[in-house]
């Protein structure tokens, strides 16, 4: 489907690519994508939800059609500010009052970071008492901890040394850290990912270390969310440790509702039909159910 497009400015002069479908619905769904990819890989969100809600997709800085050095960020919290800029734009331009934050992978960390720590940027944008607060937060594959050998290495890095490494200005691009072959059981997803020039298969070490550092901070304490939270993860995810995701939300966010998809890889929305249908059923039972009931 056709989406309107805009470029909006950030607090520090970057330009964010935003696309949206505004059809006069009460609710908005704001989608934040994962690391190395871009919002164009999530047009299914607009196609799936447009009959129920307005939809906004955007590219984080350094990703897709937004400005900034490719696959790089100096401070991870800049991504949270990007989300804030998009929300502010929708509130001012379209008088948005009801919205759902939908996020995938690194985008889930961005969303959790913003909800947990928005007061650090002195943002009064989200305020429960003033009636401007998410109706729901939906997190797909939040990166509580990397999967496999990468996760094992990350867990052994003391916080002090992680802070030191993440503070280095020197950064190099490396490939192979993210096993994108296992995004989906559908091999075409991997092939299309490689062909897409807006994807980054090489990521800056600075970005990777900022992700690890921020994830450890955010997922070491409760998020402090005051709305329904739904979390979905596949049991065969090779990028995010599904066991660590389940453990965190059971221990520190017990009110969040977990949805574990058996045999699912990292991108459940791009899975083969027998697995993808489980994901779409979850969307029906959570986001669409909320929208229809309000």
What are these regions (language model features)?
Residues 227, 241-250:
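Short alpha-helix in the alpha/beta-hydrolase fold that links the catalytic acid
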Residues 46-69:
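Conserved alpha/beta-hydrolase
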Residues 33-37, 106, 235:
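Active-site glycine-rich loops that stabilize anionic/oxyanionic intermediates
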Residues 34-44, 55:
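Serine-hydrolase catalytic-loop signature spanning alpha/beta hydrolases and amidase-signature enzymes
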Residues 110-204:
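Alpha/beta-hydrolase-fold enzymes
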Residues 38, 65-94, 277-278:
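Catalytic nucleophile-loop/oxyanion-hole region of alpha/beta-hydrolase
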Residues 264-277:
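Catalytic histidine-centered segment of alpha/beta-hydrolase-like enzymes
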Residues 225, 231-233, 237:
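Short beta-strand/loop motif that positions the catalytic acidic residue
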């Amino acid at each position: 489907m056709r989406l309107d497009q805009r470029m909006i400015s950030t607090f520090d002069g970057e330009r964010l690519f935003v696309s949206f479908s505004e059809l006069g619905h009460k609710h908005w769904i704001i989608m934040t994508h994962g690391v190395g990819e871009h919002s164009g890989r999530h047009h299914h969100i607009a196609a799936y939800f447009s009959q129920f809600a307005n939809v906004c997709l955007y590219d984080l800085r350094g990703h897709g059609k937004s400005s900034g050095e490719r696959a790089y960020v100096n401070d991870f919290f800049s991504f949270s500010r990007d989300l804030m800029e998009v929300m502010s734009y929708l509130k001012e331009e379209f008088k948005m009052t009801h919205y759902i934050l939908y996020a995938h992978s690194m985008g889930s960390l961005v969303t959790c970071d913003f909800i947990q720590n928005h007061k650090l940027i002195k943002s009064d944008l989200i305020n429960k008492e003033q009636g401007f607060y998410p109706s729901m937060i939906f997190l797909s594959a939040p990166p509580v901890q990397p999967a496999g050998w990468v996760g094992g290495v990350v867990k052994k890095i003391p916080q002090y040394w992680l802070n030191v490494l993440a503070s280095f200005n020197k950064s190099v691009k490396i490939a192979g850290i993210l096993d994108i072959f296992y995004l989906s059981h559908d091999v075409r997803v991997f092939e299309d990912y490689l062909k897409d020039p807006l994807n980054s298969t090489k990521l800056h070490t600075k970005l990777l270390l900022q992700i690890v550092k921020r994830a450890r901070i955010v997922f070491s304490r409760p998020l402090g969310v005051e709305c329904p939270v739904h979390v979905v993860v596949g049991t065969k995810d090779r990028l995010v440790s599904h066991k660590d995701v389940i453990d965190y939300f059971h221990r520190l966010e017990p009110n969040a509702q977990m949805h574990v998809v058996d045999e699912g890889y990292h991108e459940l929305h791009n899975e083969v039909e027998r697995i993808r249908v489980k994901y779409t059923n979850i969307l029906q039972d959570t986001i669409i159910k909320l929208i229809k009931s309000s």
